Every structure is written in structure tokens, then in C-alpha cells.
């Protein structure tokens, strides 16, 4: 994850998305059949489980099951191994998906910059393979 810091400060920061901001491109851009991610746990369920705001993500329903299991089988902490595994695996998949979205955003920003540069060159009259008349003389 630290590679984005190197690219952001030492490379071209204009094509590096901000990891704390929402993506600028629509999620279905290039993927017409792509489904939007939906929360499984409702706001009321998360409030009833007293989840902190940092833990209210797409894996909150697994965390609610884990906390309920821990509460129901209190002295036996090893009884909730499967619930813990499910929550950890969901968090891992969510992390990987967010990193893929970050990379997708970065590549789309690079593509946008290349297209703008090409359009600016064509507006000047310097397309690919063309020579400026001043240079030709």
C-alpha cells in the first residue's frame, strides 16, 4: 500500500488519486453489467450492535455475528473460530477490492491525461506524423 505514497510525492501527482476521497469515475464505467455494492447489515442492526463508526463497513454483518457468538459463548473463546475467519476473510476481500478500485482510478486518470494531451496536440495542428510548418522550413 505504500507504493501510492512514492508515486504521489515523487511521480506525477495529477494522475494519482487521493485514497481518502471517493472515486471520480462512475463505478460502471467500462462495465455495463457491474452491480453496485450493497450493505447487508442495516443501519438499525449496526446501531443495535453498538458498532463504532470505523467498523461499519461492508463486512459489518459478519462482525455482528462474531460479537453475538462471543457474547453467547463467553468463557469458551475458541467457539467462534469460524465467525472470526468469515469476518477476517470478508475484510481481506474488501481490502483487495478497494485496492483494485484505487488502481482502476489511477489508470483511468492516466488515460484521461493522455487523451487530453493528444487532443491538445491535435488542436495545435500537430497530429501524429505531422510536422509543424515552421520546423519543416
From Swiss-Prot:
Presence of keyword Transferase: no
Motif segment (Cx9C motif 1): 59-69
Membrane topology label: Peripheral membrane protein
Domain of life per record: Eukaryota
Motif window: Cx9C motif 2: 80-90
InterPro entries from the UniProt entry: NDUB7
List of residues that carry Phosphoserine: 73
Entry domain remark: Contains two C-X9-C motifs that are predicted to form a helix-coil-helix structure, permitting the formation of intramolecular disulfide bonds.
Described function: Accessory subunit of the mitochondrial membrane respiratory chain NADH dehydrogenase (Complex I), that is believed not to be involved in catalysis. Complex I functions in the transfer of electrons from NADH to the respiratory chain. The immediate electron acceptor for the enzyme is believed to be ubiquinone.
This protein's name: NADH dehydrogenase [ubiquinone] 1 beta subcomplex subunit 7
Species assigned in the record: Pan troglodytes (Chimpanzee)
Gene name tied to this protein: NDUFB7
Amino acid at each position: 500500500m505504500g507504493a501510492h505514497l512514492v508515486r504521489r510525492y515523487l511521480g506525477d501527482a495529477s494522475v494519482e488519486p487521493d485514497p481518502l476521497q471517493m472515486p471520480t469515475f462512475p463505478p460502471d464505467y467500462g462495465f455495463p453489467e457491474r452491480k453496485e455494492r450493497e450493505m447487508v447489515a442495516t443501519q438499525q442492526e449496526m446501531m443495535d450492535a453498538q458498532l463504532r463508526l470505523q467498523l461499519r463497513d461492508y463486512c459489518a454483518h459478519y462482525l455482528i455475528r462474531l460479537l453475538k457468538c462471543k457474547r453467547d459463548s463467553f468463557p469458551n473463546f475458541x467457539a467462534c473460530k469460524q465467525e472470526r475467519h468469515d469476518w477476517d476473510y470478508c475484510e481481506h476481500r474488501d481490502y483487495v477490492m478497494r485496492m483494485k478500485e484505487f488502481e482502476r482510478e489511477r489508470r483511468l486518470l492516466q488515460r484521461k491525461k493522455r487523451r487530453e494531451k493528444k487532443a491538445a496536440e491535435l488542436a495545435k495542428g500537430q497530429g501524429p506524423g505531422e510536422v509543424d510548418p515552421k520546423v519543416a522550413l
